[in-house]
């Protein structure tokens, strides 16, 4: 039942160090593609590109 959830939980991973730093929810109807945001990475200690992982 969770596989067809409209707002699933996703994990955001840093593209530089590959650490999974954030867990958030997204709406699949509005954003069917992978989410990409610039967020702070505590491991890199800078703002980097974070991408949705599955």
Curated annotation (Swiss-Prot):
Signal sequence annotation: none
GO MF term (any one): structural constituent of ribosome
Record keywords: Ribonucleoprotein, Ribosomal protein
Keyword rRNA processing listed: no
The keyword DNA repair is assigned to this record: no
GO biological process, one term: translation
A single GO cellular-component term on record: ribonucleoprotein complex
Similarity comment: family membership: Belongs to the bacterial ribosomal protein bL33 family.
NCBIfam families per the UniProt record, alphabetical: PRK00504.1, PRK00595.1, rpmG_bact
Entries under PANTHER family matching the protein: 50S RIBOSOMAL PROTEIN L33, CHLOROPLASTIC (PTHR43168), LARGE RIBOSOMAL SUBUNIT PROTEIN BL33C (PTHR43168:SF2)
Entry protein name: Large ribosomal subunit protein bL33
Organism: Parafrankia sp. (strain EAN1pec)
């Amino acid at each position: 039942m969770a596989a067809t959830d409209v707002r699933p939980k996703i994990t955001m991973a840093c593209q530089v160090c590959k650490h999974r730093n954030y867990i958030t929810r997204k709406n699949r109807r509005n954003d069917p593609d992978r989410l990409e945001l610039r967020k702070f990475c505590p491991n890199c200690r800078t703002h980097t590109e974070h991408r949705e992982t599955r």
